[in-house]
């Protein structure tokens, strides 16, 4: 009994132990649970991201569906916002309509002329700025009040339009006026903004010149003549009316190149600005003459019209305006003189009509400059058009000294030895100017330029001084300064060097040497005009190359302009 009972108890204990061991093997460990938790968390995060992306994509698709289902928008031009701001007059679909303004629209932006978007029910739902495309028109005048403007279309027909806010702002600041181009919508009846006239502006240098008469040397007589012709009518109009005098419409400055024609014209504008008392404002319209020429028929004439429209618009405010045509012979040649073109047959009459139209504008004058005055059409030069003709001569020795004084001043670095020798800096500068003028105008063999032989056998020698100009003198002074600068750099002691007499001598020689090969001997008759003996023909031009001579001679046996093979050119 005892043994059987013990066996039963032992078996029960073993069974219990066996079950306990099996339960421990089936239970996961803590690490396993943590790993499983992290895995599930990662999967859950990915699912959340995928769900969010799917939701965003679904929203985008729904938005596209809604956009595709929306009706198309209509745009119009706001004409007027009615009192209360709940309705507005809008021009749309070629008709004027009174439409409701949707709630939420900022009515402060709804200014006349604005572009607005209309909803499905033809209500104003959005302000879209101002139209940036349309037709181009030219302003004729702004009507009193600043709300309307008279413009001319491409056919010259006049229209009255209302002014949008951007253009009104320009008008109130006096930044737009007669002659300017504006963007318009003829159907809506509005002008929106000013459009730059690129095709004309690139030909015009509109400025208030800073050149005064004191900046011009050796041209006292010419300055006095242009002062009497241009400034007196502007500054004393009452006296001109009292003496029953008409101010000149134009002035022609003619003479050799580089002698100050453009400087005189600029100085006139500067002087007028100081004397007119118009806030110091004067305008100098410097026309780049050759660029006016255009291969398209009528373009040159149109640009001339626009230039004078510009001048008139500026002059209306009482400001003096000078229209300056440089190289006038390039644009307004004698009619019928063209070889392969008859452009001058239409360009010259256009200028004549514009000059004749200037008679009622007291503040506009035309100044032309040319070194080939004989090529300008005579109709332009007759009294009543370019009334005053002023020849700008080449500088003589006295004038050359005056010009040199503008460039050689005592503030420049001067040669210490020269300053010590002359006594002070003023005397040193005077010595430099004496050396420059005496060397330029010396009448000796080293300064011979060309020798002319006339048809009667007489001869005349032209020297470098006969071809002097203000530009040449300025260039010689610059050469002398550069020579001194290079010597100072080479010495390593720049403070101990300055412009010397030798620098001036070298500069004059360098300038003359560069001109040795420049004389044009192909047409000897041109030299008769240069020498002033226009009554005789030149048959031979001998060019001096220092110690060398190159001869160009004319022979009666060959046609004009042909080379005989002996260094001669026919002029008979």
Swiss-Prot record:
Keywords: ATP-binding, Coiled coil, Nucleotide-binding. Residues 1-18 have a biased composition (Low complexity). It comes from the Bacteria. It holds the Pfam family Prot_ATP_ID_OB_C. GO terms for molecular function: ATP binding; ATP hydrolysis activity. Belongs to the AAA ATPase family. Homohexamer. Assembles into a hexameric ring structure. This is AAA ATPase forming ring-shaped complexes.
């Amino acid at each position: 009994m005892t043994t059987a009972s013990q066996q039963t108890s032992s078996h029960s204990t073993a069974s219990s132990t066996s079950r306990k061991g099996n339960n421990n093997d089936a239970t996961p460990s803590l690490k396993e649970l943590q790993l499983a938790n992290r895995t599930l968390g990662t999967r859950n995060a990915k699912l959340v991201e995928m769900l969010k992306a799917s939701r965003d994509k679904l929203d985008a698709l729904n938005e596209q569906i809604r956009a595709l289902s929306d009706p198309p928008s209509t745009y119009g031009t706001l004409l007027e916002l009615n009192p209360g701001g709940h309705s507005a007059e809008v021009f749309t679909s070629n008709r004027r309509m009174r439409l409701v303004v949707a709630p939420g629209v900022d009515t402060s932006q709804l200014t006349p002329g604005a572009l607005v978007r209309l909803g499905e029910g033809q209500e104003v739902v959005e302000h879209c700025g101002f139209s940036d495309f349309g037709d181009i028109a030219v302003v004729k005048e702004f009507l009193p009040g600043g709300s309307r403007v008279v413009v001319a279309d491409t056919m010259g027909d006049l229209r009255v339009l209302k002014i949008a806010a951007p253009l009104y702002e320009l008008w109130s600041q006096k930044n737009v006026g007669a002659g300017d181009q504006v963007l318009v919508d003829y159907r809506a009846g509005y002008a929106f903004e000013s459009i730059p006239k690129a095709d004309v502006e690139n030909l015009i240098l509109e400025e208030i010149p800073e050149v005064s008469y004191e900046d011009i040397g050796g041209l006292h007589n010419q300055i006095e003549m242009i002062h009497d012709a241009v400034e007196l009518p502007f500054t004393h109009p009452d006296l001109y009316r009292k003496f029953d005098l008409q101010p000149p419409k134009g002035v022609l400055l003619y003479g050799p190149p580089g002698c100050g024609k453009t400087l005189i014209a600029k100085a006139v504008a500067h002087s007028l600005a100081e004397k007119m008392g118009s806030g110091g404002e004067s305008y100098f319209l410097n026309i780049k003459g050759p660029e006016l020429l255009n291969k398209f028929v009528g373009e040159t004439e149109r640009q001339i019209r626009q230039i004078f429209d510009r001048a008139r618009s500026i002059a209306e405010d009482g400001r003096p305006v000078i229209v300056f045509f440089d190289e006038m012979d390039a644009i307004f040649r004698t009619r019928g003189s063209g070889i392969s073109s008859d452009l001058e047959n239409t360009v010259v009459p256009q200028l004549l009509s514009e000059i004749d139209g200037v008679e009622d504008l007291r503040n506009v004058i035309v100044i032309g400059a040319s070194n080939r005055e004989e090529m300008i059409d005579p109709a332009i030069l007759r009294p009543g058009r370019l009334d005053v003709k002023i020849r700008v001569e080449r500088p003589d020795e006295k004038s050359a000294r005056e010009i040199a004084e503008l460039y050689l001043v005592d503030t420049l670095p001067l040669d210490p030895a020269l300053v010590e020798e002359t006594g002070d800096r003023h005397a040193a500068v005077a010595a430099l100017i004496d050396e420059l003028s005496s060397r330029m105008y010396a009448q000796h063999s080293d300064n011979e330029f060309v020798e002319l032989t006339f048809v009667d056998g007489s001869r005349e020698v032209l020297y470098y001084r006969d071809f002097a100009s203000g530009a040449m003198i300025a260039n010689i002074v610059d050469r002398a300064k550069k020579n001194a600068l290079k010597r100072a750099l080479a010495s390593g002691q720049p403070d101990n060097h300055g412009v010397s007499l030798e620098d001036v001598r070298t500069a004059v020689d360098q300038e003359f040497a560069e001109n040795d090969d420049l004389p044009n001997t192909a047409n000897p008759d041109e030299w008769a005009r240069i020498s002033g003996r226009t009554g005789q023909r030149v048959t031979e031009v001998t060019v001096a190359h220092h110690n060398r001579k190159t001869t160009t001679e004319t022979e009666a046996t060959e046609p004009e302009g042909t080379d005989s093979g002996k260094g001669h050119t026919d002029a008979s």
